[in-house]
Amino acid sequence: FAEALVSGSVLPAKCTVSSEEGRQSIADYLGVSMGSEIKKVARLACAGGTNVAINRANYEGLSSCQAAAIVSGGGKGCFWGCLGHGDCEAVCDFDAIKMDPFSIPVVDIAKCTACGDCVEVCPKDLFSLQPVNHQLWVACKNLEMGDDILEECQVGCTACGKCAMD
């Protein structure tokens, strides 16, 4: 990123981990406009914690989502669901992700810099970077249509479309 910044192919506003004052200082130093960027935050496409989703197996290996995913996708009943071992929390340098009591990561949008580390580390590709002003997103990555997912997770998306109508 630094090379692209110095070469002029990106503006300082694209630096997600720096403060606004820091981005302005970089712009002043380089003699360029800071530019503008809509703040993004990490969003998780799973709400299936241990209180609403079943496990199909008791995984007892290394406490890591990466490791659990290698062992037949982990123990979660929902194939697409969060494995809940906290790799995302461990990789977040900004202390923006905490595991809730039901083993689901919760993102503190005030602390999230949209650095993308959680996106990279999640073996289920459940994190994405979304504009902070987008308040509606589907917190489920189930790709099947219909009610079958509800046998695995009480809050699984059935693709009914009701959320799009509201």
Task: Say what each PLM segment does.
Residues 1-166:
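Ferredoxin-type iron-sulfur electron-transfer modules and their immediate structural context
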